[in-house]
Amino acid sequence: MTDAILQVSDLSVYYNKKKALNSVSLSFQPKEITALIGPSGSGKSTLLKSLNRMGDLNPEVTTTGSVVYNGHNIYSPRTDTVELRKEIGMVFQQPNPFPMTIYENVVYGLRINGIKDKQVLDEAVEKALQGASIWDEVKDRLYDSAIGLSGGQQQRVCVARVLATSPKIILLDEPTSALDPISAGKIEETLYGLKDKYTMLLVTRSMQQASRISDKTGFFLDGDLIEFNDTKQMFLDPQHKETEDYITGKFG
């Protein structure tokens, strides 16, 4: 098996001393889509935000354990979190384009990193928008506001904004839950098309989505990782009753 790109060991997360994630250990392989499923409050989004230290932005969050990326524990005091979030990018549940042009949305991270050359920026915009499967829809209006796009288009621009910084890993926190089925389908197609270049971790409430596009699935309940397996194996032959009850809709 290929060496893991991300190794989580004994990870616990507390919100104001209340444990939200309980000693979770698992690893993620390169160029796979991993779905994280479970009911609300199960810990799946907490785990996701822990993988590029987004939890640090909340002063009430305390994290213990380790997350090893590129041979280094990202929770080391020496970690440059700006560089970390460039390599491990995130797409949120609600489309959150900045109130600026489509072009400026996509190059935002590049400008923060000091890139000013227009040719470099132009090429990055086209490549990222193509990667997010939205180039043909917006190539003639790059200087229009991204706010004027549909919800599905806005979310794909947000994907492009992450792609522009050349991440190794993309974290997606329920990226289609606020979208109509057609727009959600386009996002799924986009993610599946990116799998040969990126490692992706997807929090989803849709069992159908998890089964359609993910290679592996982790099921969370009350802060515990109950089961982690190949997606096909988990959905056909879950090893825990809680997993079976959840994926068959008996609770959630």
UniProtKB/Swiss-Prot annotation:
GO terms for cellular component: plasma membrane. Residues 6-247 form the ABC transporter domain. GO terms for molecular function: ATP binding; ATP hydrolysis activity; ATPase-coupled phosphate ion transmembrane transporter activity. Its main location: membrane. It is found in: Cell membrane. InterPro entries: AAA+_ATPase, ABC_transporter-like_ATP-bd, ABC_transporter-like_CS, P-loop_NTPase, PstB-like. Keywords: ATP-binding, Cell membrane, Membrane, Nucleotide-binding, Phosphate transport, Translocase, Transport. Its EC number is 7.3.2.1. The keyword Cell inner membrane does not apply. It comes from the Bacteria. ATP binds at residues 38-45. It is a peripheral membrane protein. One of its GO terms (biological process) is phosphate ion transmembrane transport. The keyword Translocase applies. CDD domains: ABC_PstB_phosphate_transporter. It catalyses: phosphate(out) + ATP + H2O = ADP + 2 phosphate(in) + H(+). It is an enzyme of class 7 (translocase). Pfam families: ABC_tran. PANTHER family: ABC TRANSPORTER I FAMILY MEMBER 17. The complex is composed of two ATP-binding proteins (PstB), two transmembrane proteins (PstC and PstA) and a solute-binding protein (PstS). Belongs to the ABC transporter superfamily. Phosphate importer (TC 3.A.1.7) family. Part of the ABC transporter complex PstSACB involved in phosphate import. Responsible for energy coupling to the transport system. This is Phosphate import ATP-binding protein PstB 1. It comes from Streptococcus pneumoniae serotype 4 (strain ATCC BAA-334 / TIGR4). The gene is pstB1.
